[in-house]
Amino acid sequence: LAGYLAMRYILWRSLQSLIYTGPLDFIGMALLYLAEMYGLILLFLGMFVNLWPLTGRPTILPKDATDLPTVDVFIATYNESDDIIRITAIAATQMEYPQDRLRIHICDDGGTLNKRGQPESMEAAWERHYRLRRMAKELGVNYITRGTNGNAKAGNLNHALNHTDGELVLMLDCDHVPTTNMLQRTVGYFLADPKLFLVQTPHFFINPTPVEKNLVGVGNPNGENDMFYRTIHPALDFWNASYFCGSAAVLRRSHLMEVGGICGKTITEDSETAFLLHSKGYNSVYVEQPMVCGLSPENYDDYALQRTRWAQGML
């Protein structure tokens, strides 16, 4: 229906609405027409890409536990509360995977040496540093921080990459709690395909966004994440073009290090990294089953800031 209406609009716009009334009017009319045609081209391209969603991908389970690769779990944090970090770290320790092949790391960018050395942030940074180190020791996981906060999250993850050596890396935001079977349902794909660099899983959120909260009285509308993770991403998977979405993803270290780790040239380091590795001929897999439980921004300011950052980075 959308395609039919778009074609009808193109015919009307091209054959009946373009009337020359003067040079200045023509310039404005032409610019608007070209902008509309560009938008419609993107619409049809998106519809074409989404024609063949790849669903029902079979799970590849490892046959022999001795063949399982080593896995580093990175829990990236900056200024989130200790309680949120603790829940995710505990869940990571409960994942069903051989313990001698699993290492969990809290990657803290809120307690860096730089923050601990600045008068305005010194006290809070030192307190956070000691608290998270104590928490990590209590839970039996590692605590990693660095000297500065350069390149934000990308720099944090790259620092952790340079201080670990697991064959695979599970990336988690600190408010993304993994299921116990997450590694069991993702690691097997890497054993089946040596050129695979990414297995991405959906982001599932337990709380509504500020926009969804205001949609009272209109039933239970599908959120924007549903459209991306249930419709768009399975279609991208058909074209071997899955995104790295920054969290809830397993990556192969060797391929990642070929491009210098997580790319930090833009503020959407995850998508940039996926584009670069796809351009080198490596493969990706999207597993449609949600295997993390996360938190959406709770207020409109944080929501707008997050979406603005995504939009700027993709541009």
Which residues are covered by each model-predicted region?
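Catalytic donor-sugar/metal-binding loop of nucleotide-sugar-dependent glycosyltransferases
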Residues: 265, 274-292
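A conserved hydrophobic helix/loop-capping motif in glycosyltransferases and polysaccharide synthases
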Residues: 72-80, 95, 189
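Short, acidic, metal-binding catalytic loop of nucleotide-sugar glycosyltransferases
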Residues: 88-101, 111-112
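Long helical/loop segments within the catalytic core of UDP-sugar-dependent glycosyltransferases
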Residues: 131-140, 144-168, 179-267, 278-279, ...
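Cell-envelope/extracellular polymer assembly enzymes that use nucleotide-activated donors
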Residues: 70-72, 103, 257, 272
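N-terminal membrane-anchoring/stem segments of glycan-assembly enzymes
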Residues: 1-67
